[in-house]
Regions:
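Short, solvent-exposed aromatic-acidic interface loops
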Residues: 147-152
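A short, sequence-level motif marking secondary-structure junctions
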Residues: 137-140, 161-163
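Compact, glycine/acidic-enriched structural inserts
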Residues: 153-173
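A surface-exposed partner-binding patch
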Residues: 5-128, 172-175
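Short, surface-exposed beta-strand/loop micro-motifs that present aromatic residues
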Residues: 130-136
């Protein structure tokens, strides 16, 4: 699916390999009275246009499945790290009409785009305010962990959003 954005044309990145069944993540929502239904294709397009990005299909699959949430399988070991470098996802952000929701992509992008720059999209956070970020810049891809206490350095976590999902597991410290 070709999408025209800005002065250049981008192509939606396909799912390279089928990622795991999203039921396995055991995503749950907080009973906050919010509407957690999947975003419409029009809303996805509006969000992409507002930030001049193209969301990868594997990330859209998560939005359509649960539109964010808190995963039970929340632990990931970044590329090149060992068990001691394990990271945990507290929540995936949702995409809905509410532009002020602190768990929503609109607000998260408003806060983080000036820090991260164009083409980097926070999709999840840990419990301490650090962000799991999709790199959507041209000729780039992957998921990074933005460590705000260390001058916002980006640590490579996975080569794609699907690979991040595939690598999530239950933190053995909580079993």
């Amino acid at each position: 699916m070709d999408i025209q954005h800005g002065p250049y044309q981008q192509v939606r990145r396909p799912i390279r390999n089928r990622m795991r069944n999203l039921d396995e993540l055991k995503l749950r929502q907080i009973a906050d009275g919010g509407d957690h239904k999947p975003p419409s294709s029009e809303l996805v397009t509006e969000f992409e246009s507002a930030f001049d990005i193209v969301l990868p299909t594997d990330y859209i699959a998560l939005l359509m499945y649960s539109n964010g949430g808190y995963p039970e399988l929340d632990s990931v070991i970044p590329i090149g790290m060992n068990e001691s470098g394990r990271l945990s996802i507290n929540r995936f952000y949702r995409l809905d009409e509410n532009r002020c929701d602190t768990e929503g992509l609109w607000r998260v992008m408003k806060v983080w785009k000036p820090i991260l720059g164009h083409g980097l999209l926070p999709v999840a956070s840990d419990g301490g305010g650090n962000q799991f970020v999709l790199d959507l810049r041209a000729n780039a891809c992957g998921v990074y962990f933005c460590i705000h206490d260390e001058k916002f350095i980006l640590q490579h976590v996975a080569d794609s959003f699907g690979k991040l999902i595939d690598s999530l597991h239950i933190n053995p410290d909580f079993i």
